[in-house]
């Protein structure tokens, strides 16, 4: 799984990105999604054309992003995924002639940007479907012609064009737009790949758009399945178009975003593509002096989501597993994965639990882990992950996995209660 940050959230000066690159690499982030929308805008060109002294010059714009790409190359930070310029879904050009002109501009700009992507070796490209001025019954034919034209402009057989789900403006409200229905989007992709004669089309799932459209992300992911090559992780309040840091739009001590269905869906399809963190509205709300301190949080969030999505894939790596922990998390493991990936036993640091049975497992002294076969993994089922991981590494154990029960297929809603000895109670 590739962990990526959006360019606007992390590269503060695209023409002089060295400091941003150094700060990203210092926390273990090695890639950003190249965003052509920071350099060129089809709607901006349209507005510029109507002015008395147009400023847009195609050659000048091309030189601008070539200069930025050169900076990326010089610092060894070349992207493998890019996003072409998007048109604001709230845009209202005014008349049908401007819509047509806008869509023609989008095609021209996208072809130019695709060529730039291929020149820098970036072959996964996120492209916004056409929507401006199109009636629902016109959307498929217009986008079919649009995307097949873009595919024919690709000069490298490895180039993949990723459609993305959209919302639309309806009397000031953001509602479901083009490619917002998973089954319809899947049909579009299959038809486009068939017409193109090769699998050059895929999908980028923006979970923020799903939230604005009030969608179940698990159903969306399962409808698209392996067609999903990239996922944009961002948050909003379900009403306003925003790109916020996950878990920051909180109310009542919890996020208002349906992360449960997002993680479950990506886990169901064994997603292993690009995880793209996009947080530009949160980032720019901070002073430039504080923004670099967000980078470790970005890395932690990407690692966290990758871990959650990969929980079952990580279990498949080992021929046998043993659990560490004999509490609520162990119980949830046994409920959700106990039959499919049965543990040999579990262990716990509490001596009072040794040689007892919990959820059908024998509870042993952690010292027993020293005798495990080499192909056996130790899965930490306890909230004190870092402490237990250090303990295991000190014992010479290398095959360490993590289990977390926040986004399980099903839950025990009653928490496990154990009797507390008087001396233990006094120490709490």
Residue ranges of predicted features:
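Active-site beta-loop-alpha junctions enriched in small/polar residues
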Residues: 7-11, 37-39, 84-87, 130-132, ...
């Amino acid at each position: 799984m590739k962990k990526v940050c959006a360019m606007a959230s992390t590269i503060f000066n695209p023409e002089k990105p060295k400091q941003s690159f150094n700060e990203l690499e210092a926390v273990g982030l090695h890639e950003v999604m190249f965003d052509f929308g920071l350099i060129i805008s089809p709607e901006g060109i349209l507005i510029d054309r109507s002015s008395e002294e147009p400023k847009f010059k195609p050659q000048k714009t091309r030189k601008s992003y070539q200069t930025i790409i050169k900076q990326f190359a010089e610092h060894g930070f070349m992207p493998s995924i890019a996003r072409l310029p998007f048109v604001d879904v709230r845009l209202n050009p005014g008349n049908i002639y401007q819509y047509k002109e806008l869509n023609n501009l989008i095609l021209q700009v996208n072809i130019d940007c695709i060529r730039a992507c291929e020149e820098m070796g970036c072959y996964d490209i996120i492209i916004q479907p056409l929507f401006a001025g199109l009636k629902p019954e016109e959307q498929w034919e217009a986008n079919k012609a649009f995307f097949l034209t873009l595919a024919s402009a690709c000069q490298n057989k490895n180039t993949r064009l990723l459609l993305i789900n959209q919302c639309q403006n309806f009397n000031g409200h953001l509602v479901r737009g083009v490619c917002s229905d998973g089954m319809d989007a899947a049909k579009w992709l299959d038809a486009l790949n068939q017409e193109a004669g090769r699998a050059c089309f895929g999908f980028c799932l923006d979970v923020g758009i799903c939230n604005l459209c009030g969608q179940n992300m698990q159903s969306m992911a399962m409808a698209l399945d392996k067609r999903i090559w990239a996922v944009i992780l961002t948050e909003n309040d379900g009403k306003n178009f925003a790109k916020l840091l996950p878990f920051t739009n909180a109310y009542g001590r919890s996020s208002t975003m349906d992360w449960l269905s997002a993680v479950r869906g990506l886990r169901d399809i064994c997603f292993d593509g690009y995880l793209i963190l996009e947080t530009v509205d949160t980032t720019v709300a901070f002073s430039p002096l504080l923004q670099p301190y967000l980078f470790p949080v970005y890395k932690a969030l990407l690692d966290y989501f990758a871990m959650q999505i990969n929980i079952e894939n990580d279990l498949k790596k080992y021929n046998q597993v043993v659990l560490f922990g004999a509490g609520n998390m162990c119980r949830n493991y046994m409920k959700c994965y106990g039959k499919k990936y049965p543990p040999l036993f579990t262990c716990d640091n509490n001596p009072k639990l040794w040689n007892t049975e919990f959820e059908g497992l024998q509870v042993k002294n952690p010292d027993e882990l020293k005798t495990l076969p080499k192909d056996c993994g130790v899965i930490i089922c306890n909230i004190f992950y870092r402490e237990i991981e250090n303990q295991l590494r000190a014992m010479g154990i290398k095959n360490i996995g993590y289990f977390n029960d926040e986004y399980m297929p099903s839950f025990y809603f009653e928490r496990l209660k154990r009797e507390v000895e008087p001396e233990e109670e006094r120490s709490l």
